[in-house]
Amino acid sequence: MPEMPEVETVRRTLRPLVVGKTIDHVDIWYDKVITGDPETFKRELKGKTFTVVDRYAKFLLFRLGDLTVVSHLRMEGKYHLTTWDAPVDKHEHLQFAFTDGSSLRYADVRKFGRLQLVETGTEFQVTGLKNLGVEANSPEFRLDYFEKGLKKRSMNIKSLLMSQTLVAGLGNIYVDEVLWQSRINPLTPANELTKDQVKQLHSAINETIEEATKYGGTTVHSFLNAEGGAGHYQEKLKVYGKEGQPCPRCGEDFVKIKICGRGTTYCLHCQKR
């Protein structure tokens, strides 16, 4: 699933492609890609102009004046620019057809991604957005906020970071990375972390998100930005996807277990309970 650095990379590459373009019409080839009524989605967007491409955590927010399209890419969602009359691929589910003849298409092999049309200003009432914590690497993600939030929660730190309720934007890849960097066992209850561990984890989260965004995100499966380019942060990964390989810090082989239903790779020596 694209995490915050990947979605931010998509946002940055989409912005010059669509901002200022006016929608002539919308074609929907898979109705379930829309949360709500597809006909209303098409009717309300006709004649609207893309003004801003925003993002919160893993959600894209397309601003069109008084309306906003909330887009969650989920596992495999991708956007790319083409033309109205380009052949429709079987994995393409929607297009915003612009008055200049170009078209922004949404493709999704797994069909898990969703788009929802809402009034601008109400987007944080959307399911998925309304319960998110503050964004990682944002001014709101202060150390004192993080410390207080961790003290109130007894679930293991891996599950908490994956839940998005305290800090939003991290997924399986970056959670494994920041826990390894901080030498924290993923099964440690959040409220048992020491002050030093919390400080190290807070720094690791901010630094990793910033660096991963700088490298255009991580492509380990199929992630591509809106220009069709892959990310490069996979070349920097230290632990994710490296089960059985030696830890670059101590030489002990990484192990993999399941936590909250997700594969979790860590070092038994460096990340002791």
UniProtKB/Swiss-Prot annotation:
SMART domains according to UniProt: Fapy_DNA_glyco (SM00898), H2TH (SM01232)
CDD domains: EcFpg-like_N (cd08966)
Catalytic center residues: 2 (schiff-base intermediate with dna), 3 (proton donor), 58 (proton donor), 262 (proton donor)
Highest taxon, organism lineage: Bacteria
Known partners and oligomeric status: Monomer.
Family, per entry: Belongs to the FPG family.
Function text: Involved in base excision repair of DNA damaged by oxidation or by mutagenic agents. Acts as a DNA glycosylase that recognizes and removes damaged bases. Has a preference for oxidized purines, such as 7,8-dihydro-8-oxoguanine (8-oxoG). Has AP (apurinic/apyrimidinic) lyase activity and introduces nicks in the DNA strand. Cleaves the DNA backbone by beta-delta elimination to generate a single-strand break at the site of the removed base with both 3'- and 5'-phosphates.
Protein name, per record: Formamidopyrimidine-DNA glycosylase
Gene coding for it: mutM
